[in-house]
Amino acid sequence: MDLAEQMLAAAGRKATRLGLTNVSFRTGDVTSLPFDSNSFDAVTSRFCLMFLPEIPKAATEIARVLKPGSWVAAAVWSAPEKNPSIGLSMAAIKQVIDLPPPDPTAPGIFRLAKPGELAGIFQQAGLVDVTDQEFLAEWSYASAEEYYTSLMEIAAPVQNLMAKLSDAQKQDVKQRITQAASNYRRGDRIVFPMAIRIAAGRKPL
């Protein structure tokens, strides 16, 4: 479920590539889930919650639809300095157009990067056995061009900013992004370090 049609389309294409047939995709708002209470064995969220204006309301809705004893796990981005692939693209855009300083309390990529923040929201929603851990990994791409293509497909905040640019500005940003990405070449691939936080909690019996 997602509010963004392009994200659902990307998920659908990936499911097709993987040959998955037991999955469905639908547009919806996590702060008002169209499902009965106590109806899900598990809920997962992948890089979604930090973009919501009402995160506590979303957590309460997730807790509502979970069956007693069932779990939710949500992945969000960790600190920006640990995720250069994201900062790289935003820096390139800022070199082309003026952007206002980000509001740390507003919805955004790193809104839930602070350790324990999402865990606290889950606890307030009534979940128990709540955990919050940071995981380190890598993103690997065949080329800087592949990284750029992937970025334009899945990074909604970048997509929204790029949509406001002229064709010449878009080309300028693309060149800046691919040049900066080339600094992360390892052998014949582009490899970025990444860090995510995963918070999980269980609905009480």
Language-model segment annotations:
Residues 1-36, 42, 56-60:
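Class I SAM-dependent methyltransferase SAM/SAH-binding core
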Residues 13, 30, 106-205:
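Conserved Class I S-adenosyl-L-methionine
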Residues 16-19, 41-42, 90-92, 148-151:
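Short, hinge-like loop/turn segments at secondary-structure boundaries
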Residues 39-47, 73, 196-199:
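Short SAM/SAH-binding signature in class I
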Residues 41-56, 78-80:
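A short SAM/SAH-binding and catalytic strip from SAM-dependent methyltransferases
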Residues 56-57, 67-142:
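Conserved catalytic/acceptor-binding region of the Class I
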